[in-house]
Amino acid sequence: MANIKSQKKRVRTNEKAHQRNVAVKSALKTYIRRTREAIASGDKAAAEAAFAIAGRKLDQAAGKGVIAKNQAANRKSSLALQINAM
């Protein structure tokens, strides 16, 4: 355990950031899963609507540094390819 005051604060702030990042990643997984389920069901309109939300959330997560920008781009590209193949 840290003894220095500033380090104690860093431990607290790091834990808050960790909790926030876990929540954002969990939400991302949910939106991506909804998009994949819509693709699997064959409903192109629902898939495109879900993809619009998922793409926006991926960009937000990349902007906040939760995931890398390339990872967001790769995931969006993969989902877009699947939707276009419908």
UniProtKB/Swiss-Prot annotation:
Free-text function comment from the UniProt entry: Binds directly to 16S ribosomal RNA.
Single GO biological process annotation from the record: translation
Protein's name according to its UniProt entry: Small ribosomal subunit protein bS20
Disulfide bonds: none
Signal peptide: none
Family to which this protein belongs: Belongs to the bacterial ribosomal protein bS20 family.
InterPro entries according to UniProt: Ribosomal_bS20 (IPR002583), Ribosomal_bS20_sf (IPR036510)
HAMAP family listed in its UniProt record: Ribosomal_bS20 (MF_00500)
Basic residues bias: start-end ranges: 1-11
GO cellular component terms given for this protein: cytosol; small ribosomal subunit
Protein's organism: Bifidobacterium animalis subsp. lactis (strain AD011)
Pfam families listed in its UniProt record: Ribosomal_S20p
Region described as Disordered: spans on this chain: 1-20
MF GO annotations: small ribosomal subunit rRNA binding; structural constituent of ribosome
Keywords assigned by UniProt, alphabetized: Ribonucleoprotein, Ribosomal protein, RNA-binding, rRNA-binding
Coiled coil start-end: none
